[in-house]
Amino acid sequence: MKVILKENVENLGHIGDIVKVAPGYARNYLIPRNFAIEATEKNAKALEHAKRQLEYKRNKVLEQARLLVAKIEGLSLSISHQAGEEGKLFGSVTNMELAELLKAQGVEIDRKKIVLAEPIKHVGEFTAVVKVHPEVAANLKVVVTKAE
């Protein structure tokens, strides 16, 4: 019996694969647990349609992410912190502060998507990576100055 997988099934296949299985395995395990549907012409067409819609949405989200990356890379954030004589900050610049500065610039990003290679604890220029999408990331320029 041929079935179309709706979930990834170990040792069988991935979502959307059409696989041949024993009729009992399909009727008693895969179909009742909603892991698969019977591979009919109608179901195959519905699967193709769903794949096209998913691909369209994925491309649209990716395009929006690329536009956001272009906007972020055009920005340079300036932040002033209290610092000692040698330029060492009292505390550090966190991704939460960077997220608030981005929000003030009109770019709303979750703080967890801002990755600092190392904590910013000195005055100077730094680069933070903003993971906008799993496939797209932006480099954000951060300038830290000493507060007077």
Swiss-Prot record:
PROSITE patterns: RIBOSOMAL_L9. The lineage of its organism: Bacteria, Pseudomonadati, Thermodesulfobacteriota, Desulfuromonadia, Geobacterales. InterPro entries: Ribosomal_bL9, Ribosomal_bL9/RNase_H1_N, Ribosomal_bL9_bac/chp, Ribosomal_bL9_C, Ribosomal_bL9_C_sf, Ribosomal_bL9_N, Ribosomal_bL9_N_sf. GO terms for cellular component: cytosolic large ribosomal subunit. This is Large ribosomal subunit protein bL9. The gene is rplI. Keywords: Ribonucleoprotein, Ribosomal protein, RNA-binding, rRNA-binding. One of its GO terms (molecular function) is rRNA binding. Coiled coil: none annotated. Belongs to the bacterial ribosomal protein bL9 family. One of its GO terms (biological process) is translation. HAMAP family: Ribosomal_bL9. It comes from the Bacteria. Gene3D superfamilies: Ribosomal protein L9, C-terminal domain (3.10.430.100), Ribosomal protein L9, N-terminal domain (3.40.5.10). Binds to the 23S rRNA.
